[in-house]
């Protein structure tokens, strides 16, 4: 990273940390956190393709394609250390009971993906960082519905990065949990409703909100599509507590 990029990233991190402390979420973009100019184009070409992403029977939305990795990270005095976690299995998530495995992408073998992971983990304010944790990295390509209903991921932080979008809709929303009953419609306006454009990023503290996105809207001359990197800064109970 150049000196100018590092300086920009430092200023961007200060604002992100302040926004997270003040309101529980922060909107930013790839330039503000110091990602290289061609990063999104190169990352999208490498990973958002039919050789990497797969559709799974029983998944929801039914036309979603996906892949996944889980990173084990540790913060030491000399900085951030990362390695591949030994499993990527998810259990009882997104309203689907049981254990599920998806295609694994070994991100740490790729320098650009490793840079993204380091950059995203640095978005977490220093005082909120776990010394030893796991970081879920999901690639989602969606064509109609992005999600089904407002929900929690039951993790510490969520990070969404939009790599590409064709068409409209897909407006990300955050509701206060008390404003979304388990059954029925929200009883108040969302705290945030924002259409994330390619290159934009949101990070939020998961316990403070129920989140989701509106359906994609196809352009007049084609098919809608959104490519997104969806990451979770996991609680220990997701992987590490069970392993210990």
Predicted regions located by residue number:
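Signature of the catalytic double-stranded beta-helix
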Residues: 72-134
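Generic detector of solvent-exposed, compositionally biased contiguous segments
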Residues: 2-11, 67, 74, 78-79, ...
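Catalytic core of non-heme Fe(II) oxygenases with the double-stranded beta-helix
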Residues: 129-196
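Short, solvent-exposed loop/turn segments at secondary-structure junctions
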Residues: 32-34, 142, 164, 179, ...
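Intrinsic-disorder/low-complexity, polar/charged segments enriched in Ser/Thr/Lys/Arg/Asp/Glu/Gln
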Residues: 27, 156-158, 228
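Structured loops at beta-to-helix junctions and adjacent beta-edge loops in soluble globular domains
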Residues: 31, 76, 140, 162, ...
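N-terminal auxiliary "cap/dimerization" subdomain that precedes the catalytic jelly-roll/cupin core
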Residues: 1-94
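Catalytic core of Fe(II)/2-oxoglutarate
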Residues: 173-244
